[in-house]
Amino acid sequence: MQTFYGKSHILHNVGLTVNEGEIVVLLGRNGAGKTTTLRSIMGLTPPREGSVNLFGTEASRMPPYKVAELGVGYVPEGRKIFANLTVEDNLRVPLARPGAWTTKRVFETFPRLAERRDNRGRQLSGGEQEMLSIARALLLNPKLLLLDEPSQGLAPLLVKEVFQIIQAMRKEGIAVLLVEQNVRVSLAIADRAYVLDDGAIVYSGAAAELASDEDRVRSMAGASAKEWAQ
């Protein structure tokens, strides 16, 4: 994919693959192009060149609602829940696709949300809001789930809880593309990893292999393309 914001060239020949039941993490410093990659896949910032192949369908020129209909769920950074609606009403918003995920199952999977089903979105903690965002995406019964910084601003115990939920997606056969700044935790649950630097893929390989390279993990926040290519 080649993606631009106006005249600014953001993504340079970015190509990645996520298989069924696989968790893939996309890492890189702030401004590397991680969120733009998710937005390009989702049709929110379409690539100017290249293709987005979703389940055998060319989707690079599809509007976001059509991408969602193909089976892509998107949990954006910042959660984007409806603050004035109750938890239960927030879960009525998505255009549900037929499948195993129903409101009943969501409440079984997220007991915190079941306990707070009558609370408004603004009354939830950051972790509960993140769970609500993920739950809404699951009601689309996605084949691919795009997650942007799900651990942002969460206490360590809540990070652990959210990541356990993400891990459970593997057993469901859902493909997960995870954008994260929490490098160690995300590498611990991922099958494979990509690293973006200045809009280009500079590392692609097994997550465990990257996690074992302490120097590279430590330098992740300021990694340069030259360093990652070594």
For each of these PLM feature ranges, what is it?
Residues 120-124, 128:
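Conserved ABC ATPase signature
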Residues 195-200, 204, 211-230:
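C-terminal boundary and immediately downstream tail of ABC-type ATPase nucleotide-binding domains
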